[in-house]
């Protein structure tokens, strides 16, 4: 019965993705697709899955082509949130995917204290056949937020991208193209000093331990010589 109901039509209303970049260059992604259920059968099918509490991603994908991973992996910690959107319309509904994407940005050491992060465009899967591109249709947006200590945030080319007040970038459709995105993080001088003295202490401790071992061997050798005499 429900297999037949799933075959009914839907109308996409909007798609949004929030990408929070971590200090490791990974990303925590929240995608939300809002759509209209265009028939009574589809509304019953959606409400049925909603009442089950937990359903597989494949079950929800039948309601909209936008319900899929728009960023490639390795991916982990998937959480699916489905809801009716009565504030939008009586037949509106939404499905959100929340997950972690590893290696979203590649990290490269630029100096003693500076690390540069560059977007790995191969992780983008926003439109079929356009891997590596920011390809967004009408009513589609992507917000990318960088770590609080990110500096020198750069995007090339700049046209088509809005810099936000919360240390991030925003793309709004319709738009299609390739952008290079990068930022830097600087290790605080205090942390560098702390790590220096910690390493110095560790080296000194290791040297002292080696000294004790050598001293022990010398004492043992001395006693063996005495015994032979």
Where are these regions (language model features)?
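Juxtamembrane/start-of-transmembrane alpha-helix segments at the extracytoplasmic/lumenal side
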Residues: 194-214
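C-terminal membrane-anchoring or membrane-association module
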Residues: 214-229
């Amino acid at each position: 019965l429900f297999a037949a109901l799933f075959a009914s039509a839907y109308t996409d209303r909007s798609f949004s993705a929030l990408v929070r970049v971590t200090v490791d260059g990974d990303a925590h992604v929240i995608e939300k697709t809002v759509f209209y259920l265009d028939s009574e059968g589809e509304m019953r099918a959606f409400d049925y899955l909603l009442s089950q509490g937990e359903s597989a991603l494949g079950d929800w994908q039948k309601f909209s082509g936008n319900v899929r991973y728009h960023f490639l992996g390795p991916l982990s910690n998937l959480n699916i949130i489905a809801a009716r959107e009565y504030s939008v319309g009586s037949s509106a509904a939404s499905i959100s995917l929340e997950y972690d994407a590893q290696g979203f940005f590649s990290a490269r050491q630029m100096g003693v204290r500076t690390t540069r992060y560059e977007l790995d465009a191969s992780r983008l899967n926003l439109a079929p056949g356009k891997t590596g591109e920011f390809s967004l249709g009408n009513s589609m947006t992507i917000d990318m937020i960088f770590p609080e200590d990110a500096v020198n945030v750069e995007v090339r080319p700049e046209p088509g991208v809005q810099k936000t007040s919360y240390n991030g970038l925003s793309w709004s459709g319709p738009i299609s193209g390739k952008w290079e995105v990068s930022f830097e993080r600087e290790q605080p001088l205090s942390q560098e000093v702390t790590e220096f003295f910690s390493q110095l202490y560790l080296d000194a401790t290791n040297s002292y331990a080696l000294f004790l071992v050598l001293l022990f061997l010398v004492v043992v050798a001395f006693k063996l010589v005495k015994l032979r005499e």
